[in-house]
Curated annotation (Swiss-Prot):
Lineage, opening ranks: Bacteria, Pseudomonadati, Pseudomonadota, Gammaproteobacteria, Pseudomonadales
Cellular-component GO terms for this entry: periplasmic space
Pfam families in the record: Glucosaminidase, Rod-binding
Active site per the UniProt annotation: 310, 335
Coiled-coil regions listed in the entry: none
Source species of the chain: Pseudomonas aeruginosa (strain ATCC 15692 / DSM 22644 / CIP 104116 / JCM 14847 / LMG 12228 / 1C / PRS 101 / PAO1)
Domain of life: Bacteria
Protein family: In the N-terminal section; belongs to the FlgJ family. In the C-terminal section; belongs to the glycosyl hydrolase 73 family.
Region of interest (Disordered), ranges: 112-155, 204-229
Record's protein name: Peptidoglycan hydrolase FlgJ
Signal peptide: none
Function: Flagellum-specific muramidase which hydrolyzes the peptidoglycan layer to assemble the rod structure in the periplasmic space.
EC number(s) on file: 3.2.1.-
Length: 400
């Protein structure tokens, strides 16, 4: 082949024809392939491809109208396709296109300005900066003792941050303290999806209301995000086991206010999903919090943080809340009774303790829960427990 033909490839002007492959070759190997003008040419070529696909879709939509038309032949479609390809090239170059090329030019120009254009090796610069920090003779440093940690130093928070540095779950980062838990964190969490924290809780808790001993009402119907610990496992294998474990402890606490202990257990079952969604501490241990009581200003004991969804005026608001943590479930029952006795707004409920269903209704009226069916659900669970106990006393295993 004549060498003059080879030298002419990519050197001629842009013909503007879609069949001219030399103009595409010039974009790749031409003298100005790194120039600003070439960026616009590449953007226009991309826009022409987009326009061509758009024209194809428009043609295919009209094929149904061409059925039975003797001029709708394969030859006609071939020339029509050639026309559309040339039309897309001409529109992107001469008529200003649809603006897609202009957007690409702005984006590619910013990328080009931010890139290193001096041809220097970035790794060489790193090596120069790090040369003074590393010893030239590693064996000379082998005999030196490592620095001892400071006395009383607590690195647990830093370790938690390091442990949760890789996961992309923002909820887990907030629980580790990487993101502040103050009110700005709640605004940052607004971008999260409704179910973005659900994988951390295999069994969603029932609708409930958080409490605070300092008199500030907190909205219920929340769901809690916890650190990913032993998913799918529960402390209780069945509802019967939950009842058998909780009922003796609930009886001691119920005697203080004269209410039926079954209703306290039923309430704990509704709050925790039969023990499957009890709030956990950061180290994975159980908080034994059966009623979702928050710490409040008067609480000086241990606490467990959790990402909750509160409902304010019908709108879901995500926030990090601190909940009371107990050493046992029995302590949770007694603290719940003390909580009711220490708040005047629940006095009507305490006065109705002899009638457990009325007791739950008065709790709901006092703002204990936002769920309008809360008292009915607790009573239904309590009656179901009574049936289980009657069947067990008869020596017949309960159904289901």
């Amino acid at each position: 082949m004549d060498s003059r033909l080879l030298s002419g490839i990519g050197a001629g002007p842009d013909s503007g024809s879609y069949t001219d492959l030399n103009r595409l070759n010039q974009l790749k190997v031409g003298k100005d392939r790194d120039g600003e003008a070439n960026i616009r040419k590449v953007a226009q070529e991309f826009e022409s491809l987009f326009l061509n696909e758009m024209l194809k879709s428009m043609r295919s939509a009209n094929e149904a109208l061409g059925d039975g038309n003797f001029m709708n032949s394969q030859t006609t479609k071939q020339y029509q396709d050639m026309y559309d390809q040339q039309l897309s090239v001409s529109l992107s170059k001469n008529a200003g296109g649809i603006g897609l090329a202009d957007v690409l030019v702005r984006q590619l120009s910013k990328m080009k300005q931010g890139s290193r254009g001096n041809g220097e090796n970035p790794f060489a610069r790193v090596a120069e900066n790090g040369a003074g920090r590393w010893p030239s003779n590693p064996s000379a440093q082998a005999g030196k003792a490592l620095p001892m940690p400071e006395a009383g130093r607590d690195d647990s928070k830093l370790l938690n941050q390091r442990r949760l540095a890789l996961p992309g779950k923002l909820a887990e980062r907030m629980l580790a303290g990487i993101v502040p838990s103050a009110s700005p964190a709640a605004s940052q969490m607004q971008s999260l999806g409704q179910d973005s924290y659900l994988p951390a809780q295999s069994y969603p808790a029932a609708s409930r209301r958080g409490f605070s001993t300092d008199g500030v009402d907190s909205q219920g119907s929340r769901r809690i995000a916890q650190p990913p610990l032993a998913r799918g496992k529960s402390m209780f294998a069945s509802a019967d086991e939950f009842i058998a474990t909780m009922l003796p402890m609930a009886q001691k606490a119920a005697e203080r206010i004269g209410v039926d202990a079954r209703y306290l257990v039923a309430q704990a079952a509704l709050e925790t999903g039969w023990g499957k969604s009890i709030i956990r501490q950061q180290d994975g241990g159980s908080s034994h919090n059966l009623f979702g009581i928050k710490t409040g200003s008067r609480w000086d004991g241990a606490s467990a943080r959790a990402l909750t969804t509160e409902y304010e005026g019908g709108k879901a608001v995500k926030e990090i809340a601190a909940f009371r943590s107990y050493s046992s479930f029995e302590q949770s029952f007694h603290d719940y009774v003390s909580f009711l006795q220490g708040n005047d707004r629940y006095q009507n409920a305490l006065d109705s303790a002899a009638n457990p269903e009325r007791f739950m209704q008065e709790l709901q009226r006092a703002g204990y829960a936002t769920d309008p069916q809360y008292a009915r659900k607790v009573a239904q669970i309590a009656r179901q427990m009574q049936t289980y106990q009657a069947v067990a006393a008869a020596g017949t295993p309960p159904l289901g």
